[in-house]
């Protein structure tokens, strides 16, 4: 009797947790415009540069195998007044690297940004290295920042004569605040007559809801959806020359986004992610596994003594076929995501089989969602 009561209490508790989770999801269904869209033109710019990392403990590039590292080292030393042309250079403490970073929007001259340093040659480990002065160029070929500093490596490598241990990626590192911005990208935000919002997930309904929320807040028709990914805003007269204040008011408005039903499948890892609006029509699902087992057990034939025979190995192969009992279930019309998952789990289906079943249901026209295979 106590066990039955405990089970019932557990079921009631689970039901309460599910109800609370459902109400929490409903309460947080809306999102800020700030989280749904970006301001067109306000973005990062990618920078790239080529440089040298020094101070490596014999884990740098092999100069005989990587000619550009040797040439870069010679050119750098010559700029400093050291002439080594014709000399034999034998060092494993230098590595050629590519330096990348993202120039933040509205970054001013003299501020700093993070950079990522990646080995370009056959360096084994960048641990303990220092990046020398490296100009970072934009897509237009201009220098926007200069990077230099000590690398922080998350991975490591240790090896001996007969064994080696590698953890993480020791040939990639980061330099926090390792680049100084030398050139600014001009963007006159306050002089714009209108501003465009670029939706992160294009959707007609969401674009219309964003425009409606902005117009209701301002009391005038200021926002207009142009396409499923763009909403154009006309700057009201009271905000002329103060676009920042206008956008500050707009981006805090709450909107209920409308997302298309989609199932994302990663076949390599077996991960399946389904949206809340996935619906399935009536469909019957049967699943069974056919397993073929082939085992090799070679036998040794040993002749009797003085029989003029010889020892031979004879193959012996056994083949077995087993088929799991097929399980059959009917998924009713209009079931939700949770019901679909529960029904398929009730068949004892694993992630790999679930991928095939979802694709088959989609091919049968019974699933109302797009399937994206990664």
From Swiss-Prot:
GO terms (BP aspect): bacterial-type flagellum-dependent cell motility
Entry keyword set: Bacterial flagellum, Periplasm, Signal
GO molecular function term, any single one: structural molecule activity
Compartment(s) where it occurs, according to its Swiss-Prot or TrEMBL record: Periplasm; Bacterial flagellum basal body
Principal place of residence: periplasm
Annotated Gene Ontology cellular component terms: bacterial-type flagellum basal body, distal rod, P ring; outer membrane-bounded periplasmic space
InterPro entries (alphabetical): Flag_FlgI
Record's signal peptide: 1-29
Pfam family, one: FlgI
Keyword Metal-binding recorded: no
Primary role: Assembles around the rod to form the L-ring and probably protects the motor/basal body from shearing forces during rotation.
Assembly description: The basal body constitutes a major portion of the flagellar organelle and consists of four rings (L,P,S, and M) mounted on a central rod.
UniProt family annotation: Belongs to the FlgI family.
The protein's name in its UniProt record: Flagellar P-ring protein
């Amino acid at each position: 009797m106590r066990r039955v009561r405990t089970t019932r209490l557990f079921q009631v508790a689970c039901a309460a947790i599910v109800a609370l989770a459902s109400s929490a999801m409903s309460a947080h269904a809306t999102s800020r415009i700030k989280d749904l869209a970006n301001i067109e033109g306000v973005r990062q710019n990618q920078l790239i540069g080529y440089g040298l990392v020094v101070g490596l403990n014999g884990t740098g590039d092999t100069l005989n195998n990587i000619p550009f590292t040797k040439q870069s080292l010679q050119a750098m030393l010559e700029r400093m007044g050291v002439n080594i042309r014709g000399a034999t250079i034998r060092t494993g403490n230098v590595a050629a690297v590519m330096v990348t970073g993202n120039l933040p929007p509205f970054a001013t001259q003299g501020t700093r940004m993070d950079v990522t340093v990646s080995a370009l040659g056959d360096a084994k480990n960048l641990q303990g290295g220092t990046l020398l002065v490296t100009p970072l160029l934009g897509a237009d070929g201009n220098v926007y920042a200069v990077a230099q500093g000590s690398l922080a490596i998350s991975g490591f490598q240790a090896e001996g004569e007969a064994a080696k241990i590698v953890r993480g990626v020791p040939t990639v590192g980061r330099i926090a605040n390792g680049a100084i911005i030398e050139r600014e990208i001009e963007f006159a935000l306050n002089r714009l007559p209108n501003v465009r919002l670029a939706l992160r997930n294009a959707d007609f309904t969401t674009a219309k809801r964003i425009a409606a929320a902005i117009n209701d807040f301002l009391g005038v028709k200021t926002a207009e959806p142009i396409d499923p990914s763009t909403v154009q805003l006309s700057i009201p007269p009271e905000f002329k020359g103060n676009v920042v204040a206008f956008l500050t008011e707009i981006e805090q408005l709450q909107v209920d986004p409308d997302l298309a039903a989609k199932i994302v499948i990663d076949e390599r890892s077996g991960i399946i992610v389904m949206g809340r609006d996935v619906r399935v029509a009536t469909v019957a699902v049967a699943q069974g596994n056919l397993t073929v087992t082939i085992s090799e057990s070679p036998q040794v034939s040993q002749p009797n003594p003085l029989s003029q025979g010889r020892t031979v190995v004879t193959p012996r192969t056994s083949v077995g076929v087993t088929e799991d009992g097929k399980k059959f279930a009917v998924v009713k019309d209009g079931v939700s995501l949770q019901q679909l998952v529960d029904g398929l789990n009730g068949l004892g289906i694993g992630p790999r089989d679930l991928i095939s079943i979802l694709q088959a249901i989609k091919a049968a026209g019974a699933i109302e969602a797009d399937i994206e295979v990664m």
